[in-house]
Amino acid sequence: LVFGLAEKLPKNVELYENSPVIDIRKGKINTLRTPESTIRAENVIMACNYEPLASGQQKQRVVGVTLSGSITRVLTQDEIETLGTETSWGVLSLHSGGATVRLTDDKRISIRNTAEYNNHRLLNKGQLKARQKIHRQSFDNRFPDLSHVPFEHLYSGVEGVTANKTNIFKRLSPNLYFAGCYNGSGI
């Protein structure tokens, strides 16, 4: 959701990534301080998904769900041909904790099919390896002709989930907004 929004920003909007805000001074002109610089802007949307919610703004309304997934190496042309004619695709489960399977633009298959409560933390290496066995079994069941394809990447992330399973967009002050609990499902 946020990536889609970022791609369509008008020329007069600046996007700052990988720049954690460590202090905010609200006002007619908001001042945001990062470890490297200070940013001043009249209007600010903080798209922070989960982390700030856990410790402040909405902690009574949100829980952190830890997800994990695996991504294959780049597929060969012969392997891609076993998948049909679509050049990139994604499948989302109707169930909120269900699997996500994608053929990426760079011709890898990404599978994410574990969602669990892990006390708002990422999975450790041992937990990740155990989850990768689940990913492998699911991958082999869905793509038996590709069961020889190894996973090259393994990841986990914490996603904010609200009780009513929707996102949060909140006005914190007249010109400061917060966006959280967005995961892109159903979009």
Predicted segments with their positions:
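Helical element adjacent to the flavin cofactor pocket in flavoenzyme catalytic cores
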Residues: 1-42
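Hydrophobic/aromatic beta-strand patches that form the interior of the parallel beta-sheet core
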Residues: 16, 45, 177-179
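Active-site substrate-recognition segment that forms the wall
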Residues: 21-23, 30, 38-77, 82-174
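Conserved mid-domain beta->alpha element of the FAD-binding
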Residues: 170, 174-187
